[in-house]
Amino acid sequence: MGDSEIQYLLEKLKKLEEDYYKLRELYRRLEDEKKFIESERIRYEREVRRLRSEVERLRSPPLLVGVVSDILEDGRVVVKSSTGPKFVVNTSQYINEEELKPGARVALNQQTLAIVNVLPTSKDPMVYGFEVEEKPEVSYEDIGGLDVQIEEIREAVELPLLKPELFAEVGIEPPKGVLLYGPPGTGKTLLAKAVANQTRATFIRVVGSEFVQKYIGEGARLVREVFQLAKEKAPSIIFIDELDAIAARRTNSDTSGDREVQRTMMQLLAELDGFDPRGDVKVIGATNRIDILDPAILRPGRFDRIIEVPLPTFEGRIQIFKIHTRKMKLAEDVDFKELARITEGASGADIKAICTEAGMFAIREERAKVTMLDFTKAIEKVLKKTTPIPDLKGVMFV
């Protein structure tokens, strides 16, 4: 065999090797495409099954809503349908019998009226709006001059939720509720915000006037549903601000509005210390008119701990000034002791307004630092504005 033939065979072998590598690469690529197509086919089949089940679900007939009236000995249930009449019906074997009790809402099959599902308790949409989803950013470090009040509210609200075994060991029941009272602007709502920040419990905030409704029974129903929501989401804390709006002392008033407010308060009294136990549900009330509250709501068992939130003392005013000026750039002449001395009788809200006004005076003069003079002018402006207007009864104006 000559050299030319050997050279020809080597070139042919090399070409065959190149073709082999190309075919192998093509095979790998086709295998990858096949796997991708297979995965896509499986995904589309799942999507088709999901869409078919969705179509079947949408084609299924609607269910009737009824309320369980009674449960018979043979397992059948007396149900009052939404159309009015009562029926004796059977139940699905997949329903938990413990959930079937008088008053429960159930779904009924249109043809046989058999119970196919137990529905959750109906609540007013407003009730779900009372629940605080995002915790406030206020902590106990942001509250000045209320160390005793903070300790008392933590003992009454936080400790029973975080360490209930301490009360069981001593053999006492933890306090059920706390009432905060004091002049406006002293930090009652701020204390409740700090409690919401510190605890992992569900926090439900209600303003007392929101319980006052137009129609008879609506306010009492709202109170009942708020406490029911708190029990379902226990451990939980209910904060009722401006409690005097619904808990004022009962009088012999003949107006329908006053009578409805009194009915709402009686429902609140029953929920605070009624026949049914509250469980891990704590109540915090706040008011600045404790003198007009009904004596029934102040007795132990409803609000076990009544905490006064007074106007800040000299040391308390110094702490509050320091808290509200933490992020401010202050001149060297700012003296907190002098500021606390000349703000005798000011509330925490007044001091916050003073700090804001002092900053505004500095901005007006295009300065980055706030001086003592700015604070002095702010004190004069804010405290003059909050001074009570003199009684002008009987004075005639020309």
From Swiss-Prot:
One record GO biological process: protein unfolding
Subunit comment: Homohexamer. The hexameric complex has a two-ring architecture resembling a top hat that caps the 20S proteasome core at one or both ends. Upon ATP-binding, the C-terminus of PAN interacts with the alpha-rings of the proteasome core by binding to the intersubunit pockets.
UniProt keyword terms in alphabetical order: ATP-binding, Chaperone, Coiled coil, Cytoplasm, Nucleotide-binding, Proteasome
Binding site for ATP: G185, T186, G187, K188, T189, L190, H324
Signal peptide: none
Name of the protein: Proteasome-activating nucleotidase
NCBIfam families linked to this entry: PRK03992.1, proteasome-activating nucleotidase
Region (Docks into pockets in the proteasome alpha-ring to cause gate opening), start-end ranges: 396-398
Residue runs in coiled coils: 3-60
Similarity field: Belongs to the AAA ATPase family.
Domain remarks in the Swiss-Prot or TrEMBL record: Consists of three main regions, an N-terminal coiled-coil domain that may assist in substrate recognition, an interdomain involved in PAN hexamerization, and a C-terminal ATPase domain of the AAA type.
The protein's role, per its UniProt record: ATPase which is responsible for recognizing, binding, unfolding and translocation of substrate proteins into the archaeal 20S proteasome core particle. Is essential for opening the gate of the 20S proteasome via an interaction with its C-terminus, thereby allowing substrate entry and access to the site of proteolysis. Thus, the C-termini of the proteasomal ATPase function like a 'key in a lock' to induce gate opening and therefore regulate proteolysis.
InterPro entries associated with the record: 26S_Proteasome_ATPase (IPR050221), AAA+_ATPase (IPR003593), AAA_lid_3 (IPR041569), ATPase_AAA_core (IPR003959), ATPase_AAA_CS (IPR003960), NA-bd_OB-fold (IPR012340), Nucleotidase_PAN (IPR023501), P-loop_NTPase (IPR027417)
Pfam family, one: AAA_lid_3
Location of this chain's protein in the cell: Cytoplasm
Predominant cellular place of this UniProt entry's protein: cytoplasm
A GO cellular component annotation in the UniProt record: cytoplasm
Record-level Gene Ontology MF annotations: ATP binding; ATP hydrolysis activity
